[in-house]
């Protein structure tokens, strides 16, 4: 699976479909099992992933309870729109005012074209009212850096390896192996 995943990701380097588990399974099992079973594998993969993922319910409750009418929650993500909406609804995260996926933009974070598209929505809200920007994510370069540079956003970087949030005054290593003081 991992070898096929890396092959697909190399082939679809700048394409949001590079995260498609369906494409991984299709390439992995091509001519070995029928297409229905390949499709069923993808469904089973996401069913198990969604059910087994542990969501910090305390943090979710805090986000929901602290959200006021003037607050806007945006989610910008590299993944298939269908899968992201499935995860959002299954995990009780249906409080975002706007969700933008790389699939619908045609570019992935950290591509500037992705941020330009997402920022057109953020900039419109910032212009209308006195707004504070908070960037939350598990990858500094993908989730936080742009928003800090453009809006001096406060950040909250989540370390998935430790499953604990890191304070914004921490040195971290992102998925590329690059270290940053945040």
Task: Name each model-derived stretch.
Residues 19, 43-74:
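Short, acidic loop-to-helix structural element flanking the phosphoryl-transfer center
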């Amino acid at each position: 699976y991992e070898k096929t995943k890396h092959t697909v990701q190399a082939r679809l380097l700048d394409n949001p479909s590079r995260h498609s588990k369906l494409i991984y399974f299709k390439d992995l099992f091509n001519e070995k099992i029928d297409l229905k079973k390949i499709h069923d594998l993808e469904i089973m993969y996401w069913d198990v992933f969604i059910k087994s993922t542990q969501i910090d319910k305390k943090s979710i409750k805090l986000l929901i309870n602290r959200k006021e009418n003037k607050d806007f929650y945006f989610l910008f993500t590299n993944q298939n729109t269908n899968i992201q909406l499935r995860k959002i609804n299954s995990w009780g995260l249906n409080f975002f005012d706007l969700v933008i996926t790389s699939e619908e933009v045609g570019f992935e974070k950290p591509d500037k074209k992705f941020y330009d598209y997402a920022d057109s929505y953020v900039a419109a809200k910032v212009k209308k009212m006195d707004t504070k920007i908070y960037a939350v994510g598990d990858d500094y370069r993908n989730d936080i850096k742009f928003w800090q540079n453009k809006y001096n956003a406060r950040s909250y970087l989540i370390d998935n390896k430790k499953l604990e949030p890191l304070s914004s005054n921490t040195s971290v290593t992102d998925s590329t192996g690059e270290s940053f003081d945040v």
